[in-house]
Amino acid sequence: MGSKMAIVIVALFAMLLFISPEVACRNFKEELGEVVKETNEESDARLAGSSGGDLDKSYCPVHLPLMEYRKWIGNCRCGCCQWTTEPEVCLYCCPESHVPDLPSRPRAY
């Protein structure tokens, strides 16, 4: 019985490793009722770009009522941002319709 439970735990952990941050981001946005639209071309372009030497990350901030708690990444201020680590340049931002136009320069927090 103990070995079966260990196998189940290892299998669940392996499944968590295969879920990408982008999918988690998309599921989070769908739960909020926001429309998430992505074409196969956009998905393929991001996958092709991520095969280079740079590591891709995804950033999902906590949606707080005050805009000051959202972070700037590169030159983008958005709900989800995928960027390279060297240099930190935003590759893709998920648009948010409720975010007003903001200045192009980030503020120091």
UniProtKB/Swiss-Prot annotation:
Keywords: Membrane, Nodulation, Signal. Its main location: membrane. The keyword Lipid biosynthesis does not apply. The keyword Signal applies. One of its GO terms (biological process) is nodulation. It is found in: Symbiosome, Peribacteroid membrane. Induction: During nodulation in legume roots after Rhizobium infection. Residues 1-25 form the signal peptide. GO terms for cellular component: peribacteroid membrane. It comes from the Eukaryota. Belongs to the GRP family. This is Nodulin-16. The lineage of its organism: Eukaryota, Viridiplantae, Streptophyta, Embryophyta, Tracheophyta.
